[in-house]
Regions:
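Glycine-rich, small/hydroxylated-residue low-complexity segments
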Residues: 1-245
Length: 245
């Protein structure tokens, strides 16, 4: 395949954490890069500026909560700016003991299968004993009884002409029984689901231009014609939905 090399500059790592219950490290951590450059064979380089990853985890009353995010100030290709990116997740009311138990069960049963598959080896079968099945059920009941919440607070892509953003919030709850039919089980487990998608019209055209750039197209008029046509098509499909602004 095409060789890929990466050049990292201006790496800064910060951590203020301590071990809480189980295997959870509580506190804040961050990683920042001034630039990350990817070189792929004879193609133009992809350059990401002001890249950061950050997170915080806290525990109170046996419940875990946290914030985790990623930022990319700007991605450029062949010296031309394409877009920046921001993503922020939050989580709260996750029972620490239930999460710890589920992680341990995952390590014992699922991780060996994934490791074998990654090494192109014959993977063992995932089989739970009666005791493990009961443990899984108990852990899930305990987890959902705490009414955990998880949210993609914002995922956004920003170009020079606008922004496309997505947010998603999910509240979970314990169902009356795990033996319910799948549709009813899902309905009872998801207490609330809110999602919002918003796209500035100009971002569609920016995306088309970026794709043309990645594909090596050089005819400016053809690229602009494609961008205009697909922008109008996307606008027409989104009429009345409130997605485009």
């Amino acid at each position: 395949g095409t060789p890929i090399t990466a050049e990292l500059r201006g790496l800064t790592v910060a951590s203020d954490q301590h071990l809480g219950s189980g295997d959870f490290y509580l506190g804040d951590s961050s990683l920042m890069l001034a630039t990350l450059q990817l070189n792929m064979g004879d193609k133009p380089a992809v350059l990401a500026k002001n890249v950061s990853q950050f997170g915080s985890l806290d525990e109170a009353g046996g419940l875990l909560g946290g914030r985790f995010g990623y930022d990319v100030g700007m991605v450029s290709y062949d010296g031309k700016d394409v877009a920046g990116m921001h993503m922020l997740w939050t989580a709260k009311n996750f029972d620490a003991s239930a999460v710890q138990s589920l992680i341990e069960l995952y390590r014992d049963k699922v991780a060996p299968v994934q490791h074998a598959q990654a090494a192109n080896e014959e993977a063992p079968q995932v089989a739970l004993t009666a005791a493990e099945e009961q443990r899984l059920k108990t852990d899930l009941e305990k987890l959902l009884s705490a009414k955990p919440q998880i949210a993609l607070e914002k995922y956004s892509i920003n170009t020079s002409n606008g922004e496309a953003s997505l947010s998603l919030h999910v509240d979970l709850s314990k169902p009356a029984s795990f033996e319910l039919p799948q549709p009813e089980l899902a309905k009872q487990m998801i207490a609330q689901l809110d999602a919002k998608l918003s796209i500035d019209k100009a971002v569609i055209g920016d995306g088309i231009r970026a794709q043309a750039q990645f594909d090596g197209q050089t005819d400016a008029k053809t690229i602009e014609d494609q961008a205009a046509m697909l922008t109008e098509m996307g606008s027409g499909m989104a009429l009345g939905t409130g997605l485009l602004t």
